[in-house]
Amino acid sequence: MKVSASVKKICRNCKVIRRKGVVRVICTDPRHKQRQG
């Protein structure tokens, strides 16, 4: 899980979603998991 100020899609499987006001990236590759904050 990377915590960064700006979350970006890394590959085509990445999806940017909003969960409880937190922007997250979910992906089939666990290394691509990110959250904003």
From Swiss-Prot:
The keyword Ribonucleoprotein applies. Keywords: Ribonucleoprotein, Ribosomal protein. GO terms for molecular function: structural constituent of ribosome. InterPro entries: Ribosomal_bL36 (IPR000473), Ribosomal_bL36_sp (IPR035977). One of its GO terms (cellular component) is cytoplasm. The keyword Cell division does not apply. One of its GO terms (biological process) is translation. Belongs to the bacterial ribosomal protein bL36 family. NCBIfam families: rpmJ_bact. HAMAP family: Ribosomal_bL36. This is Large ribosomal subunit protein bL36. It comes from Albidiferax ferrireducens (strain ATCC BAA-621 / DSM 15236 / T118).
